[in-house]
């Protein structure tokens, strides 16, 4: 290789190097490549959090719906129980309810000594509260010779995307304590009446 040719190559490289800081043609592509991972992470994380918030809202709505429907009755029959569970499923739509959605409600009576016990309980995809089991009620609800309807909801939520941001499956829960609206104590009719001692 001749010395003249090497000199021309060095000159061409030097020109390219001096022109490079003034050339703006690839700046947008480089900036986009740097920002893209952050934007994708932000999008997936935001989507996962939004889905979890929406699912939690549905869990709260189901607990309030179930508690309110039970509290508006005086005797819960098997047909009414099934209708309440159907209402819970309808409120929970469009999320899949079986077997991830667990619903439970119970009539809790407080005796003269202030001890709260479960008189009857029903559950969907869950175990019902044990009859005559003692439970702790929140302050203000443990009034002697009264009853309370206790509605509980639990949902195992796994976001369709973004599980890395939520840590996988989250258990969303809510519960509602509500006094009967029409009678002092709501009974459960399973062929024989339960509750209201």
Regions found by a protein language model. Name each.
Residues 2-3, 64, 68-197:
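Short, conserved structural patches
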Residues 2-91:
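Alpha-helical assembly-interface signal, strongest on the long, hydrophobic N-terminal helix that forms
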